[in-house]
């Protein structure tokens, strides 16, 4: 489902999510109770996040198959205000084979110094647990990136979503690998950081154990409350129905 939630105004939200109904990414306008109406769709891409750069450019980051290399890569492009069109698409240059499953779900965030950082899930081989890595843009344009050294988190955490990135005060949500289902269901977790590179993870899940929860996205309502949208599914292997859920994250 890979939802991405953004604020339009005090009454309206825009929600992007992968949808079988539109055979791509559905673009919906919603109220704050998440009553939504689809406005259109985006094709041949997945895992979209959109930020506004320091220069005031509305820039999206997403996964797409590169037909020239037959590999998946993270791309960036300039997006229209309504989120229904884009231009000037450019690959970031971190490709993987198209059948690499445990890779992707990039999350882009504008960091306090005006640069852009993109986080995504990575595996060193087909069997090891996932790791979270990142790259930071060379300039405020958010087009050319260099890998950040090391890992943000290891041991199977995935679907990283930064919900706050301020000087000395970072907050993020993430999910856990599906590899150990149903014994260990996918759940959401919370972490904090001072610089967005070294993270302190609270290892206690923040979602109920009996279901699986993943792909979180969110916006602040105020200093302590965040409106969260994510994907959820029964804690079983094989084909299963995926839905979007909404929740309020209340910080201590």
Can you describe what each PLM-predicted range is?
Residues 1-47, 51-102, 109-158, 163-211, ...:
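Beta-rich carbohydrate-recognition and catalytic domains
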């Amino acid at each position: 489902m890979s939802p991405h939630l953004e604020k339009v105004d005090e009454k309206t939200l825009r929600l992007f999510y992968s949808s079988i109904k539109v055979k791509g990414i559905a673009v919906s306008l919603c109220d704050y109770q998440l009553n939504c109406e689809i406005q259109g769709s985006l094709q041949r891409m997945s895992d979209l996040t959109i930020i506004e750069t320091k220069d005031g450019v509305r820039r999206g980051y997403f996964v797409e198959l590169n037909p020239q290399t037959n590999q998946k890569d993270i791309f960036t492009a300039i997006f229209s205000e309504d989120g229904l069109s884009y231009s000037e698409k450019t690959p970031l240059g971190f490709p993987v084979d198209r059948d690499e499953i445990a890779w992707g779900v990039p999350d882009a965030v504008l960091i306090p110094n005006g640069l852009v950082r993109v986080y995504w899930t990575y595996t060193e081989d087909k069997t090891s647990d996932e790791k979270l890595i990142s790259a930071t843009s060379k300039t405020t344009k958010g087009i050319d990136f260099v890998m950040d050294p090391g890992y943000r988190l290891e041991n199977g955490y995935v679907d990283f979503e930064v919900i706050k990135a301020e000087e000395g005060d970072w907050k993020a949500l993430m999910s856990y690998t599906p590899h150990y289902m149903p014994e260990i269901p996918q759940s959401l977790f919370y972490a904090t950081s001072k610089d967005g590179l070294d993270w302190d993870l609270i290892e206690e899940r923040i979602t109920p154990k009996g279901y699986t929860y993943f792909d979180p996205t969110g916006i602040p309502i105020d200093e302590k409350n965040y409106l969260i949208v994510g994907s959820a599914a029964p804690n079983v292997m094989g084909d299963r129905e995926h839905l979007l859920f909404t929740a309020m994250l209340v910080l201590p």
